[in-house]
């Protein structure tokens, strides 16, 4: 029996198409690819906790990354490891800007992946990137790392690959109002993460709502002032009681290095009970926790253990963040 080349090509093509459709349908059915999010320009604000983890890798927690949605505008606050996966799962197909709180790598390491994937998807614009002093050095380093990759994609795809996306518009700012446009005001404020400086948080105000992102900080007057009267405070948090047990084990093992590393980490993170007291004192209406130190599995039992005692000092709702969780003020 003779089969024409055209016939073979048609069979192969049909098989390939079937395979692609099968893969896409399987992935979608498993919830790995979300439909593109439809944004309502008349809506208020919400925060998506895209990455709730810390530098140590954890399968179910990306490192620091949040999205702020204000009407039909989308901003990211930090872009940690695997943030690009959570952005895709959230169906965020466009970005209006990226803000950085500081330059620990677990807060920015995902920037290149995010820009590259938007470029491959065809988003053809330069995305504004803003942060405290150091933003330009960080972005320049990322662009240097991606220079070969970008040159290959341009050689291969030409103008089908967006070069604008890989050239973000970078602004270094000092605390104060850094954005005021179409009813949305964004204020950068200092926080306390020494010896890391500068380190900042962000306050978003839109349609009579206020959403605040702490960045990395201990509980201090500057953080308290930045969070004052927030409808929603998205804050990092540490748990002293859990770390006290870890310190006891490290001392029992005569592991002085581990003891000092834990103590140094506790110095510049927001202890849970102190955070609860602060939130109550400054009138925070809802508290959403992220960037857990130490991290833990996203189970109800582990979550209850981590926030034990916080409601003794704070009478508002406490949301224990999981990756992909959306929180409204």
Identify the role of each PLM range.
Residues 31-92, 166-228, 323-329:
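Core dinuclear metal-dependent hydrolase active-site scaffold
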Residues 24-31:
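Signal peptide processing junction and immediate N-terminal pro/mature segment
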Residues 132-170, 251-255:
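Acidic/polar short surface loop at catalytic or gating sites that assists cofactor/ion binding
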Residues 1-15:
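Bacterial N-terminal signal peptides that target proteins for export
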Residues 12-24:
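Bacterial N-terminal signal peptides
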Residues 73-74, 81-130, 229, 233:
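Active-site metal-binding motif and surrounding structural segment of the metallo-beta-lactamase
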Residues 47, 127, 138-144, 320, ...:
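Non-globular, low-confidence helical/coil segments that flank catalytic cores
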Residues 201, 210, 218-322:
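Cap/insert and terminal regions of metallo-dependent hydrolase folds
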């Amino acid at each position: 029996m003779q089969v024409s080349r055209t016939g073979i090509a048609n069979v192969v093509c049909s098989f390939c198409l079937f395979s692609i459709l099968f893969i896409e349908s399987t992935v979608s059915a498993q919830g790995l690819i979300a439909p593109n999010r439809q944004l309502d320009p008349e809506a208020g604000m919400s925060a998506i906790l895209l990455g709730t983890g810390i530098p140590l890798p954890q399968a179910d927690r990306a490192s620091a990354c949040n999205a702020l949605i204000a009407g039909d505008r989308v901003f990211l606050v930090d872009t940690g490891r695997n943030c690009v996966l959570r952005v895709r799962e959230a169906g965020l197909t466009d970005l209006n800007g990226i803000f950085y709180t500081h330059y620990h790598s677990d807060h920015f390491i995902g920037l290149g992946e995010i820009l590259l994937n938007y470029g491959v998807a065809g988003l053809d614009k330069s995305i504004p990137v803003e942060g405290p002093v150091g933003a330009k050095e960080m972005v320049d380093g990322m662009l240097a790392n991606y220079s070969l990759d970008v040159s290959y994609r341009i050689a291969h795809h030409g103008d089908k690959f967006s070069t604008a996306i890989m050239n973000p518009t970078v602004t270094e700012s000092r605390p104060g109002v850094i954005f005021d446009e179409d009813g949305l005001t964004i204020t950068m404020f200092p926080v306390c993460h020494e010896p890391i400086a500068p380190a900042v948080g962000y306050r978003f105000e839109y349609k009579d709502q206020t959403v605040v992102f702490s960045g990395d900080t201990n509980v201090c007057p500057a953080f308290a002032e930045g969070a004052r009267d927030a409808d929603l405070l998205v804050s990092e948090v540490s748990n002293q009681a859990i770390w006290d047990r870890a310190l006891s084990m490290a001392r029992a093992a005569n592991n002085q290095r581990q003891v000092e590393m834990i103590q140094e980490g506790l110095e510049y993170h927001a202890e849970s009970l102190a955070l609860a007291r602060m939130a109550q004192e400054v009138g925070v209406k809802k508290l959403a926790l992220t960037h857990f130190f130490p991290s833990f599995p996203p189970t109800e039992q582990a979550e209850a253990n981590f926030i034990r005692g916080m409601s003794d000092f704070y009478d508002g709702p406490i949301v224990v963040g999981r990756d992909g969780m959306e929180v409204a003020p």
